[in-house]
């Protein structure tokens, strides 16, 4: 069973808040409030202090690999080495990854990061300035990742954007023009990408810079989040 099949963590927020204070010294004497953020296979919580300082706690799916989570932390740290990118990625606040038992007694990895306060790209009114900001940061990100490689990035992963052929088995879920568009995309991928894959340059990528993983404020991109799909 993979993280895509396993039920996300089931958390009692009050009990988890107590656990946070017991295990992280920077929360021990703080009055904190927790609220849920959007997430698919994990649980993400926003932590607010009375001082208005905010954090994100990521409680990973019980089936998530600890090695893969450590890889994500290394990836974020590498991106933050670039002075032009440092503020675009959350700062990792935990010294090591701890584990919390959820309500079903499953062992779930816990990580603490700074919170990037803004709106999701999907819910923002974006302008040419926003698009230019996005293009510039994606280019800087790609350049920075050229000097980063770990074994964990080289993996078999269903959502690998360099091989979309697996989507063909779902094509009959669509009809008409939508089906034709998808079929043409798969055919062009087969012809121009997959047949030439060995001749194309490779590098570690974010893997999923979709419009719910990009943070915007005042028509400017201020953050990239969620590196769970990163791949070489």
Would you name each region that the model predicts?
Residues 40-50, 56, 90, 190-232:
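Active-site acidic catalytic loop and adjacent metal/ATP-binding pocket
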Residues 22-31, 187-198:
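Short Pro/Gly-enriched beta-strand edge/turn motifs at strand-loop
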Residues 59-106, 124, 128-132:
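A conserved alpha-helical element in kinase catalytic cores
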Residues 106-119:
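Conserved short submotifs of the Hanks-type protein kinase catalytic core
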Residues 37, 49, 100-108:
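Short glycine/proline-enriched loop/turn "hinge" motifs that connect secondary-structure elements
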Residues 26-48:
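ATP-binding glycine-rich phosphate-binding loop
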Residues 123-180, 202:
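A cross-family kinase active-site recognition segment
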Residues 1-31:
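Juxta-kinase regulatory segment immediately upstream of eukaryotic protein kinase catalytic domains
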């Amino acid at each position: 069973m993979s993280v895509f099949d396993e039920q996300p963590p089931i958390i009692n927020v009050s009990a988890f808040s107590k656990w946070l204070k017991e295990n992280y010294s920077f929360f021990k004497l703080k009055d904190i409030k927790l609220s849920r953020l959007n997430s698919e296979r994990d649980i993400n919580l926003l932590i607010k202090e009375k001082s208005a300082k905010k954090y994100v706690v990521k409680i990973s799916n019980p089936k998530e690999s600890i090695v893969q989570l450590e890889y994500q932390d290394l990836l974020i740290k590498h991106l933050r080495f670039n002075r032009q990118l440092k503020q675009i990625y959350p700062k990792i606040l935990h010294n090591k990854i701890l584990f919390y038992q959820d309500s079903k007694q499953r062992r779930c990895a816990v990580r603490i990061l700074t919170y990037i306060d803004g709106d999701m790209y999907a819910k923002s009114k974006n302008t040419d300035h926003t698009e230019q900001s996005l293009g510039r940061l994606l280019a800087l990100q790609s350049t920075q990742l050229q000097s980063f490689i770990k074994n964990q990035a080289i993996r078999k992963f269903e959502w690998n954007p360099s091989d979309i052929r697996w989507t063909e088995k779902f094509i009959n879920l669509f009809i008409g023009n939508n089906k034709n568009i998808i079929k043409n995309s798969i055919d062009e991928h087969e012809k121009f990408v997959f047949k030439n894959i060995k001749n194309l340059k490779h590098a570690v990528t974010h893997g999923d810079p979709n419009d719910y993983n990009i943070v915007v404020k005042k028509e400017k991109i201020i953050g990239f989040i969620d590196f769970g799909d990163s791949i070489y």
